[in-house]
Curated annotation (Swiss-Prot):
Pathway: Amino-acid biosynthesis; L-arginine biosynthesis; L-ornithine and N-acetyl-L-glutamate from L-glutamate and N(2)-acetyl-L-ornithine (cyclic): step 1/1; Amino-acid biosynthesis; L-arginine biosynthesis; N(2)-acetyl-L-ornithine from L-glutamate: step 1/4. It comes from Penicillium rubens (strain ATCC 28089 / DSM 1075 / NRRL 1951 / Wisconsin 54-1255). It is an enzyme of class 2 (transferase). CDD domains: OAT. It catalyses: N(2)-acetyl-L-ornithine + L-glutamate = N-acetyl-L-glutamate + L-ornithine; L-glutamate + acetyl-CoA = N-acetyl-L-glutamate + CoA + H(+). GO terms for cellular component: mitochondrial matrix. The record marks 224-225 as: Cleavage. InterPro entries: Arg_biosynth_ArgJ, ArgJ-like_dom_sf, ArgJ_beta_C. Its EC number is 2.3.1.35, 2.3.1.1. Catalyzes two activities which are involved in the cyclic version of arginine biosynthesis: the synthesis of acetylglutamate from glutamate and acetyl-CoA, and of ornithine by transacetylation between acetylornithine and glutamate. GO terms for molecular function: glutamate N-acetyltransferase activity; L-glutamate N-acetyltransferase activity. This is Arginine biosynthesis bifunctional protein ArgJ, mitochondrial. The active site is at 225 (nucleophile).
Length: 485
């Protein structure tokens, strides 16, 4: 049965699924950086281990190391079945109070989740082997894993290859890109960004920020991984770094949706080694410092750009959609509404069908749970499509009254890969339009004909189907819909 279903679905999976030779689909080439500016004092490597027996030559062990101790912060999945590396890394950060971290080691091909005490011991061994190779004290490294749930790591193979990973550390663009490849599962392209920035206290000093992430689609509900690592050579105290990361993630990795499921392994971490010099960014007291505010903005913008690459790689997706909720009486209520729209199968399928069905959008607004009383008032609510080319918005509903829609223009707008939906709540019951603080923004993709085959292929005997899994992996990613903490 599985074999026949596999054969039936083989020709239906998304046409841009990466083949086993690691070739990047032509439609995704534009997202691959050809160069980068990387933070001082960090070195990285991507090494082949063969965590999965089917992977005979592609990198599946990533190592990110700093020459000097780092401040570190992380947010983790809220899933009750938290993977061993999540538990170990959280304990490491807590015991060190976010200080003195030297490396992050990541394997793909096995999630090391729901693996009992043995899995916890494996995660500890991975971190300590990196510490040993680096010549630093134990528990100086964070550990992440991604892949199949419920299977033990081939820990001996991994431990044997960590010295190679350490000896091949480098700071070149090629090394960073290869490291980003090593954390991929069903991703069709490695997700890597870098940039430079300045801070008010040192306007003539350049700082650098780099980050990588992985994620693309679903294999089993609540059973896969979104991972991300950010590195900067700015000096930031741990408390400030944790606060900045939490703010950034709430507006980036916690504001994207592909299939609305919560993973066992989701982890986003940031390391700051201070190698660029300058003043240390500290947590705000009564008011935020100029450096803190500036860095928070830089990291948030960067995390948004990085997380959006995940949506652009969504399994079965043909569109990249921004939903913006404006003039909500409070940010969190607006964010809940944006999240509900982003997760609605009816909205997703309407967009795939290029149907300007604003009723489905309005329906999602109306049934959103947990919003403050008086947030949604029908006669104050408006819905529009905002074209990405900057042309005039297409109004669909204004203050609860339907507009006469130019169907031809709507069709043209919906032909584009990128689209923005704008929902204006008009300030809610109080009618305080423009006084609701920042816009709540979510990014999501549509559901196409290819979604079900793409998801189903991952469930059946996928190793019977050659050439369907990106980078030689049978694993998949699921986005964390509940907030990382």
């Amino acid at each position: 049965m599985a074999t026949s279903l596999a054969r039936m679905l083989k020709g239906q999976v998304r046409c841009y699924s990466a083949p086993l030779d690691m070739a990047i689909p032509a439609s995704k080439q534009r997202y691959i950086p050809t160069t980068g500016t990387y933070p001082q004092g960090f070195q990285v490597s991507g090494t082949h281990v063969g965590v999965k027996a089917s992977n005979t030559r592609f990198p599946d062990l990533a190592l990110i190391a700093s020459d000097t101790p780092c401040s570190a912060a992380a947010v983790f999945t809220t899933n009750k079945f938290q993977a061993a590396p999540v538990q170990v890394s959280r304990k490491t950060l807590q015991s060190r109070k976010g200080d003195g971290i030297r490396a992050v080691v990541i394997n793909s091909g096995c999630a090391n989740a729901v693996t009992g005490k043995g899995g916890l011991e494996d995660a500890v061994q991975m971190g300590r082997k990196v510490d040993e190779c680096s010549g630093v004290e134990n528990d100086s490294s964070l550990v992440m894993s991604t892949g199949v749930i419920g299977q033990r790591l081939p820990i001996s193979k991994i431990l044997d290859r960590i010295p190679t990973a350490h000896s091949t550390l480098a700071s070149t663009h090629e090394a960073w890109l290869n490291t980003a490849r090593a954390i991929c599962t069903t991703d069709t392209f490695p997700k890597l960004l870098s940039r430079t920035f300045t801070l008010p206290s040192s306007p003539d000093r350049s700082y650098r920020l780099a980050g990588m992430t992985k994620g693309a689609g679903m294999i089993h509900p609540n059973m896969a991984t979104l991972l991300g690592v950010l590195c900067t050579d700015a000096a930031v105290e741990p408390a400030a770094l944790q606060s900045i990361l939490k703010h950034a993630v709430s507006r980036s990795f916690n504001s994207i949706s592909i299939d609305g499921d919560t993973s066992t392994n989701d982890t986003i971490a940031v390391l700051a080694n201070g190698a660029a010099g300058g003043e240390t960014v500290r947590a705000p007291g009564a008011s935020a410092s100029a450096d803190y505010t500036a860095l928070q903005g830089v990291v948030t913008d960067f995390a948004q750009e990085l997380s959006q690459l995940v949506v652009r790689d969504g399994e079965g997706a043909t569109k990249f959609v921004t939903v913006r909720v404006r003039n909500s009486p409070d940010y969190e209520s607006g964010r809940m509404i944006a999240s509900t729209i982003a997760r609605s199968p009816l909205v997703k399928t309407a967009l795939y069908g290029k149907d300007a069905n604003w009723g489905r959008i309005l329906c999602a607004v109306g049934y959103t749970q947990g919003v403050a009383e008086g947030t949604v008032v029908p006669e104050r609510t408006s819905v529009s499509f905002r074209p990405v080319d900057g042309s005039e918005v297409l109004k669909l509903l204004v203050n609860g009254e339907p507009e006469t829609v130019d169907e031809q223009r709507a069709s043209v707008i919906l032909q584009n890969e990128d689209l923005e939906i704008e929902v204006d709540l008009g300030g809610g019951e109080q009618g305080a339009a423009g006084c609701g603080g920042e816009d709540a923004v979510y990014w999501f993709c549509d559901f196409s004909h290819e979604c079900i085959p793409a998801f189903a292929v991952d469930i059946i005997e996928s190793r019977e189907i050659s050439g369907l899994k990106a980078f030689g992996s049978e694993n998949a990613y699921i986005y964390e819909e509940e907030p990382l903490k």
